[in-house]
Structure formats: structure tokens, C-alpha cells
């Protein structure tokens, strides 16, 4: 007896916010490649992270005043993203923004391997938000990977 099942294509209608700890990601990439010149390729990274889901927000948090206007313009032009300069670390501004966005999105993707985000991940999951971490695996906290709903290496 064979079941003849027709599969119906399901449309995933999820809203995603991508929050980037720029300094953490840059340090990780530079450490792995041993080059200060290596940069993220957002044109391949963002679509891969979204995986056919809708982008609600993209915010790149960067410590310091020397933020590339080219990066800022590119993120705005292609992803309606923004770059937020931070006085010191991005941890607090990123955490505040994630908490503010929790009721507006289905998923938050945090680009950072920093263990400082473990409590934020726990809090957001408690609020019902799916949390994904995208980072360089070799420099990412194992606890952060365990707490996340999904880890993008």
C-alpha cells in the first residue's frame, strides 16, 4: 500500500532583524585570516542568513568614530540598514535594540561570537523570539552556540 501524498509548497513569512557587532566580527575575521584587509561580503552573507525570510532591520554597531561612509552607504542602499557608532563596546546598544525589536520580529540574528550575549539570548528566547547566531566558529563562545536556536558558521 503506497500513500500518494501531494506536497504543498509552504511560504515562510518570517520577519528577521540582523544585528551586527561589527568590532567582534571584524576581529574574528582578521584573526582567522591573519589579515587586517579581510572584509565581510554582505552581498553573499545577508541572503544566506535570511534564507528566503523577510528582512525587517539590519543594524551594524561599530565602536569608534572611524566608520566607513562606504559601508554605511552600501548597507543603507541595498538593505535599508544603518550603522550605529558606539562610545565603547557594542554590547549594550545592541542588547537594547534587540530588546526593543523583540515584539516586532520573529527572528533576531546576532552577528557576534561574544559570550556577553548569552543572557540576552536567554531573555529573547523567553520572550518567544527565535535567536540565531552567525559568527566565526573558532572564535565563538561554545555557550553562546548552545543557547542559540541556530548557529550559522
What residue spans do the PLM features occupy?
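Nuclease catalytic cores that cleave nucleic-acid phosphodiester bonds
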Residues: 64-153
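Domain-level signal for Mg2+-assisted phosphodiester chemistry and nucleotide/NA-binding surfaces
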Residues: 2-92, 103, 130
Amino acid at each position: 500500500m503506497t500513500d500518494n501524498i501531494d506536497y504543498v509548497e509552504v511560504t515562510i513569512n518570517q520577519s528577521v532583524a540582523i544585528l551586527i557587532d561589527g568590532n567582534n566580527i571584524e576581529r574574528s575575521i582578521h584573526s582567522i585570516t591573519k589579515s587586517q584587509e579581510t572584509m565581510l561580503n554582505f552581498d553573499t552573507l545577508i541572503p544566506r542568513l535570511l534564507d528566503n525570510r523577510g528582512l525587517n532591520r539590519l543594524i551594524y554597531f561599530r565602536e569608534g568614530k572611524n566608520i566607513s561612509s562606504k559601508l554605511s552607504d552600501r548597507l543603507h542602499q541595498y538593505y535599508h540598514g544603518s550603522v550605529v557608532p558606539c562610545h565603547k563596546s557594542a554590547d549594550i546598544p545592541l542588547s537594547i535594540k534587540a530588546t526593543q525589536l523583540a515584539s516586532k520580529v520573529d527572528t533576531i540574528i546576532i552577528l557576534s561570537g561574544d559570550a556577553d550575549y548569552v543572557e540576552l539570548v536567554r531573555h529573547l528566547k523567553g520572550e518567544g523570539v527565535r535567536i540565531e547566531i552567525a559568527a566565526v566558529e573558532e572564535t565563538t563562545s561554545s555557550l553562546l552556540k548552545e543557547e542559540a536556536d541556530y548557529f550559522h558558521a
